[in-house]
Amino acid sequence: MLLLWFGFFSFIFGVVIYRLYFHPLSKFPGPKLAALTSLYEFYYNVVLGGRYLWEIERMHEKYGPIVRITPHELHVADPNFYTEIYAGPTRRRDKDPRLVRLAGQPTSMFATVDHGLHSSRRAILNSYFSKKSIAGLEDMIQGKVQKLVKRLSMACDQGTVVKLDAASSALTADIISEYAHGFFPFLLDLSKFIPDKVLEKLWFHAANILRLQKLVRAQADVALQNGGKVDGQATMFGALCDPSLPVQERTLDRLQDEGFSLIGGGTETTTGTLKIVMFHLLNEKALLLKLREELEQYPSSTWADLEKLPYMRGTINEGLRLSGVITRLPRRAPDEALVYKQWTIPPNSLMSTSSHFVHTNSDLFPNPLAFDPERWIRAEAAGQRLEHMIVTFSKGSRQCMGNHLALAELYLVISTLVRRFDMDLYGVTADNIVTHREYGFGVPKERGEGLRVSITRVRDP
């Protein structure tokens, strides 16, 4: 027994000495406890509840722009180094296999560790998400938006409080499901976001997530048996089960994982951004009135025309800047040592930069926590290409391929809401909206019941 204890403590002592003095990252600055054990991160993220990102922020204030934040990971808080970590397709970047398991869809593109395999999987679907392809969906998106207008108009007539973020989730889930899989889960048609909490139970309850997974699996099975078609309609499943692909890439599990991943990725970013934008517009009505004035001067409602409106574009950019995935997305560069200032990062080291540190950088964005659409107009007038610093969709070879779809939805939905409805916040404060914790996406200090609004008037089109 004594020998067992001696062996155990000898092992622990060896790990401590190795991590502090001989590990490839041992020369990098940071707290010794973070270098020794991942329990340091565990304490902030689990015990304190999603607060490690702000502890990393404190580390950078103390130790500088590059910090060892776990025994095996570096974090760099320099926006100019972002595209080195999240590099383009000619430079290999692998994911951390320990982290992608959390995604829950192990054969999806999002959970693919290897750079080469990810590139080949992405190539299958790239054309579906090009800006040209998404522009071709505009009539379908507009049709869904008009259904939303009808539901919100009914809520106005009935004096019903609406959960605007739940409505957005329903809308975006319908759009990506119909486009990708040839079906939609009827969330918008059921209008369960009005007047009770049924939609929340339907969409976010674990049992119903499983139900949706089964539905996606059933559609994938139909597609596999019918040359990629569902009910005679061509879908993305057709590309995923193309006979030219390797057999292992055409399994039912693979189609289900990719299909469900598309729904999740096609819903959360858009909804989170819309929630941030609409909260700030309704919380500071001068912003809303300025946007409405610009929209009334240019009555066209096409995505292409809306993108040209300076204040509209600034509003969307501010929403993107203050929302989205803020968790670290670690990468490895297995084939090269990266150099940051006087530091050489050894090949295959885990490294990351949270979008939070780019989007709240006060040199790029003075008064970074303020929602200020005009900062983008000022930057453009000064010749600054500030939009290149929006990393909500990440950058490089693993950038979110659904960015054009998300942007189209945001421009079309937000412009319609501002044009067609007068509404007020209903029992919602900044503590229910502004990011205070990190659980992948930013989470507010107080969860509340979502972005609840009362609609006071339906305006003429």
Curated annotation (Swiss-Prot):
GO terms for biological process: conidiogenone biosynthetic process. Pathway: Secondary metabolite biosynthesis; terpenoid biosynthesis. Keywords: Heme, Iron, Membrane, Metal-binding, Monooxygenase, Oxidoreductase, Transmembrane, Transmembrane helix. It is an enzyme of class 1 (oxidoreductase). The keyword Metal-binding applies. Pfam families: p450. One of its GO terms (cellular component) is membrane. This is Conidiogenone synthase PrP450. It comes from Penicillium roqueforti (strain FM164). The lineage of its organism: Eukaryota, Fungi, Dikarya, Ascomycota, Pezizomycotina.
